[in-house]
């Protein structure tokens, strides 16, 4: 038994040593950045209501993909999350939906199921095809029109786009349409963020992440430690620390610890089981912790999905390590690509 552990440690040490040797200032010089859409056969479609400030992003692998999930936030809004429990029978899912609308938006998955069924995809029960669609939502009802939430029609439209006209973009699109950060003092001093992605390739291995940043806390450049988004000063011209604000307002009864969640999806072309993907998803949360402070609060629904869409052989711990880094970088992209909206300035407005 001791010899087995020794062999495993040596394999992991060799993999991580290769990663460190190739790395510069955190990001690997050996990496080649690729578009997130290069990780085939995953399809991505988005739709949003720019007037109402909400939308959804759909990731589809119509023939099925192994999926894992790790939830660290205390207030998630999710659908069919138990499908990714290693104890459950299903080994693959057909789609992942990220949506606005909080719990109201969970109906978007019905539209994705309809699209998949129409195209002949799903688990064959002998009586009907049942597409397995999992979903997690952000709370964006405090932005735009709270009466408008993603539903079956919006989910269907995003799924159709994923098949017929893939349209993934970073910024105020899809689920990122109504995303904001720095909300502890109220929406008046919060900032606009969005959805972001970052993906890399090392040899045959591809690892990427899509993140919608809708956190209670602040966002930091994980490479420099500089705060780039979050709680605004009262004159709306600069940034202040959410953590410091929390310390000063510890006895306050009107803290607004509501309406938050950061959702991330790690995508890889490496072959893993859903048990392994749950571990990779858990490691991915390290990327959130590097870039968002505070994170994983009781008011956040912070969740990381991990998806395997290929057959490349790769070390699980290496992919988990890379997953954390691509999440941290995707968070920065979500901030940098966002545009001001609904009275909330973006990072570009502070430069």
Predicted segments, located by residue:
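Charged, low-complexity surface segments at secondary-structure and domain boundaries
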Residues: 1, 20, 142-144
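Bacterial N-terminal signal peptides that target proteins for export
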Residues: 2-15
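Intrinsically disordered, low-complexity segments
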Residues: 2-4, 21, 301, 346
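A detector of low-complexity, intrinsically disordered, Ser/Thr/Gly/Pro/Ala-rich segments
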Residues: 5, 19, 34-35
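Bacterial N-terminal signal peptides
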Residues: 14-24
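Alpha/propeptide regions of enzymes that mature by internal proteolysis
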Residues: 30-351
